Structures are given as structure tokens and as C-alpha cells.
From Swiss-Prot:
<comment type="function">
    <text>Involved in the regulation of the intracellular balance of NAD and NADP, and is a key enzyme in the biosynthesis of NADP. Catalyzes specifically the phosphorylation on 2'-hydroxyl of the adenosine moiety of NAD to yield NADP.</text>
</comment>
<feature type="binding site">
    <location>
        <position position="247"/>
    </location>
    <ligand>
        <name>NAD(+)</name>
    </ligand>
</feature>
<dbReference type="Pfam" id="PF20143">
    <property type="entry name" value="NAD_kinase_C"/>
</dbReference>
<feature type="binding site">
    <location>
        <begin position="72"/>
        <end position="73"/>
    </location>
    <ligand>
        <name>NAD(+)</name>
    </ligand>
</feature>
<feature type="binding site">
    <location>
        <begin position="187"/>
        <end position="192"/>
    </location>
    <ligand>
        <name>NAD(+)</name>
    </ligand>
</feature>
<dbReference type="Pfam" id="PF01513">
    <property type="entry name" value="NAD_kinase"/>
</dbReference>
<protein>
    <recommendedName>
        <fullName>NAD kinase</fullName>
        <ecNumber>2.7.1.23</ecNumber>
    </recommendedName>
</protein>
<dbReference type="GO" id="GO:0019674">
    <property type="term" value="P:NAD metabolic process"/>
</dbReference>
<dbReference type="GO" id="GO:0003951">
    <property type="term" value="F:NAD+ kinase activity"/>
</dbReference>
<keyword id="KW-0067">ATP-binding</keyword>
<keyword id="KW-0418">Kinase</keyword>
<dbReference type="InterPro" id="IPR017438">
    <property type="entry name" value="ATP-NAD_kinase_N"/>
</dbReference>
<comment type="similarity">
    <text>Belongs to the NAD kinase family.</text>
</comment>
<feature type="active site" description="Proton acceptor">
    <location>
        <position position="72"/>
    </location>
</feature>
<feature type="binding site">
    <location>
        <begin position="146"/>
        <end position="147"/>
    </location>
    <ligand>
        <name>NAD(+)</name>
    </ligand>
</feature>
<dbReference type="InterPro" id="IPR002504">
    <property type="entry name" value="NADK"/>
</dbReference>
<dbReference type="GO" id="GO:0046872">
    <property type="term" value="F:metal ion binding"/>
</dbReference>
């Protein structure tokens, strides 16, 4: 008997491979005596089904498990929609790296079957909450599972800004931008810019400069409860962009402030019982395997 009563499905929209895996998953779930629903955005591209098609808001209310078929980008989008909701997320990898979507396509029936039987490990991941202020006015706010990034947008020019942590001045910097990353995002964009790998269970945030003009500027790891504030210098000759998980963005103006804190809403992410963070790092990042001892 399944531990879950209703499963919601979300698929990558531009992938024939994802569509194939989604068909396999639907066929498997049809035999499990479980109510299954399909995300309405996915249904626009995947019409070969007789499932109930609903919004993500409805999925959050009626489902207790969401299965995402796609890459990490697909799961990032789902994470922002379902964080703080009483629903768990499981990922089937039809993307590239797959740090978050860790079930391979050839294991769908076996691994998903184990999860439905209650054989899984669950972990809570925190998200970042970003706010853009223009004077006293709140211009926009968003959440991100991986990272909040300040960057020049379409222009190749340096940004000048000041960094404050818990209202304490840290530095004034000229660089291509700054990556503010959660532990989940530490193996994504932050890693490619020289940031440290952090275990996802850590209550910490890492700030990674992008091509800083000062060689001594290095990534800083701060406590997860920190309030991070960026003051965009008024003499900037461009309007930096703030991007959340590489998927949503807002354009700032010189003199704006960006405040990033830990969101109170947690994401419940589940994995197969054999999930191991360090094994994932070895396989995804190409680390050397054990060869019999030193």
C-alpha cells in the first residue's frame, strides 16, 4: 500500500526524453491505485494522457507527493512553487548534472516503487528570500532554492556596490557581480565561480564574488540567519540585474538596495534510500573513485 494518496506530475517542457520518461511513470502509477494529477503547464506539451489537469496551486493543496521529470532547472522551478507547502518533492533526472533530480530514467519503476512504499530519506532545504528596495519602497521580492545573483545583465561592465552583513559593513567592491548561494546552490553557479562545496544540511550562506577587481576578495561563508544587504553605488553606469535561480529576474537602478535572508518556508525533498551526497559529488563532478587504498 502506498504511503502517498495523491501524486502530482511535472515534466520538462522541451525534451522528448522527459516525455518518454513521463509516459513510463504514468503507466507505472496507473497500476498503483493512486490518484495522479498533471501540472497544467506540462499538459500543454504532453497531451497523450487522461489525467486530471490542474494548476500548481491545486497540486499543492491536493497532492502529498510531487514528482518532477526533468533536470535541476525543472526542480528549481517546482521548489519555488511548493516550498512551505505540505508536499514532498522527488526528482527523476532527464537533464544534465542532476544534483537534485537523482533517480535515473532506467530506475523509474523500482525507485519510485520504493518511495511509494515509504522507503526513502527526507531532508528539508531552505530557500533564499530576496527583496529589492528603491528608497523605502519595496519594488519586488522573490525566493530561490539555489542562489540570488547580482550581475550586469547584457552589458560587460563592472558593478560597484557595498556589502553589509547584519548591518555591519564588509567591503566596497567592483566586480562582475555577486552570487549569494544556499548550501543547495553551492554545487551550481557558485561552484563554477570558485565557491566552496557545502553539505546541504548546513545552516549557512556563501557569498561568491564574480571576477572581482581585487585579488584578495574571496568567498565568504556566513550563518544562515544572516541578513545580507547590497547597496548598489549611485555612480554605476549601468543597471544591474538580480536573478533568482537563473529563472526570474528584476532590473535595479543605481542607489537601490537588495536584501537577502533565509526564507521561513522549507522545501521537503526526498531521495531513494541509497542517496549519498558525497557519492553524488563523485559521480557528477568526476572525482576519482576508491581504488583499493593508499
Amino acid at each position: 500500500m502506498s504511503q502517498f494518496s495523491c501524486v502530482g506530475l511535472i515534466g520538462r517542457l522541451d525534451s522528448d526524453n522527459a516525455a518518454y520518461s513521463l509516459r513510463r511513470l504514468i503507466s507505472f502509477l496507473a497500476k498503483q491505485n493512486i490518484e495522479v494529477m498533471l501540472d497544467e503547464e506540462t499538459a500543454e506539451f504532453y497531451t497523450e494522457n487522461e489525467l486530471e489537469i490542474v494548476s500548481r496551486e491545486t497540486l499543492a493543496k491536493r497532492c502529498d507527493l510531487i514528482i518532477v521529470v526533468g533536470g535541476d532547472g525543472s526542480l528549481l522551478s517546482a521548489a519555488r512553487a511548493f516550498a512551505g507547502k505540505p508536499v514532498k518533492l522527488l526528482g527523476i533526472n532527464r537533464g544534465r548534472l542532476g544534483f537534485l533530480t537523482d533517480i535515473s530514467p532506467d530506475e523509474i519503476e523500482y525507485k519510485v516503487g520504493e518511495v511509494l512504499a515509504g522507503k526513502y530519506v527526507s531532508e528539508s532545504r531552505f530557500l533564499l528570500h530576496s527583496q529589492l528596495y528603491r528608497g523605502e519602497e519595496l519594488i519586488s521580492e522573490a525566493v530561490a532554492l539555489n542562489d540570488v545573483v547580482m550581475h550586469p545583465g547584457q552589458f560587460i561592465r563592472m558593478i560597484e556596490f557595498e556589502l553589509y552583513i547584519n548591518d555591519e559593513f564588509v567591503y566596497r567592491q567592483r566586480s562582475d557581480g555577486l552570487i549569494i548561494s544556499s548550501p543547495t546552490g553551492a554545487t551550481a553557479y557558485a561552484l563554477s565561480c570558485g565557491g566552496p562545496i557545502m553539505h546541504p544540511s548546513l545552516d549557512a550562506i556563501v557569498l561568491v564574488p564574480m571576477n572581482p577587481h581585487t585579488l584578495s576578495s574571496r568567498p565568504i561563508v556566513v550563518h544562515g540567519s544572516s541578513r545580507i544587504r547590497l547597496l548598489i553605488a549611485k555612480d554605476n553606469h549601468l543597471s544591474p540585474h538580480i536573478t533568482n535561480d537563473g529563472q526570474t529576474h528584476v532590473v535595479t537602478k543605481p542607489g537601490d538596495e537588495v536584501v537577502v535572508t533565509k526564507s521561513p518556508d522549507l522545501l521537503e525533498l526526498i531521495h531513494p534510500t541509497d542517496h549519498n551526497f558525497y557519492e553524488t559529488c563523485r559521480s557528477k563532478l568526476g572525482w576519482a573513485s576508491h581504488t583499493g587504498g593508499c
